[in-house]
From Swiss-Prot:
UniProt entry tagged with the keyword Transport: no
UniProt cross-references to HAMAP family, sorted A to Z: Hypx_phosphoribosyltr (MF_01467)
Catalytic EC class: transferase
Lineage: Archaea, Methanobacteriati, Methanobacteriota, Stenosarchaea group, Halobacteria
Provenance organism: Halomicrobium mukohataei (strain ATCC 700874 / DSM 12286 / JCM 9738 / NCIMB 13541) (Haloarcula mukohataei)
Domain of life (superkingdom): Archaea
Protein task: May catalyze a purine salvage reaction, the substrate is unknown.
GO MF assignments: transferase activity
TM segment ranges: none
Official protein name in the record: HGPRTase-like protein
PANTHER family: HYPOXANTHINE/GUANINE PHOSPHORIBOSYLTRANSFERASE, XANTHINE PHOSPHORIBOSYLTRANSFERASE
Annotated NCBIfam families: HPT_Archaea, PRK02304.1-4
Family of this protein: Belongs to the purine/pyrimidine phosphoribosyltransferase family. Archaeal HPRT subfamily.
Assigned EC number: 2.4.2.-
Length: 189
């Protein structure tokens, strides 16, 4: 069994405001992230993502950063982090992130009209973060070459799909009766 699948099956589940979360090194930073798990994930992303002609990797803070940094190192594609803090730099674009559990403002810097981007994130759950991000990238005039998330949590509204985008995933899971259940070992293409 691969490490990503096993690590999800072993993940503890917590409940917050009626929403069930798995606690995982990729999505939460705890338990500790082992290098062999990160390496496996990065290799799977590189194999699955459409990387030809990509100018930049774009990832939302905070839990996409470690994944995207590793992919950037392996592909030599520069990394742009969409931040939760406004800096007021020239060209900064704001977006409203609405997820199943929070609402925040985020800020895109260093993405320009005509840039060809790969969007990477840790988990696709409600699609709120990625829907807001793809909308901002469209407004900028960037070309979204591909969207890849490590984990898809099934069972929720997918605002990203509602906006006409499809995210590739490495594995699809659900939380049933307090446990992670693997719905698709290989995720979505």
């Amino acid at each position: 069994m691969d490490q990503l699948k096993q690590s999800l099956l072993d993940a503890p589940i917590i409940e917050k405001d009626g929403y069930h979360y798995f606690v995982h090194p990729i999505s939460d930073g705890v338990p500790m992230l082992r290098p062999e798990l990160l390496r496996e994930i990065v290799i799977k992303i590189i194999r699955k993502a459409e990387l030809e002609d990509v100018d930049k990797i774009v990832t939302p803070a905070a839990m996409g950063i470690h994944i995207s940094t590793a992919v950037s190192l392996m592909t030599d594609i520069p990394l742009v982090v969409v931040r939760k803090r406004q800096y007021g730099l020239d060209g900064e674009v704001s977006l409203s992130q609405v997820t199943g559990y929070s609402e925040n403002e985020m800020y895109v810097n260093d993405v320009y009209e005509g840039d060809r981007v790969l969007v990477l994130d840790d988990v696709l759950s409600t699609g709120g973060t990625l829907a807001a991000l793809t909308g901002a990238l469209e407004d900028i005039g960037a070309d979204i070459c591909d969207i890849v998330c490590v984990i898809k949590k099934e069972g929720g509204e997918n605002k990203l799909a509602d906006d006409g985008y499809h995210a590739k995933t490495l594995i699809n899971v659900d939380v049933v009766d307090g446990e992670v259940v693997v719905v698709d070992d290989y995720g979505d293409d």
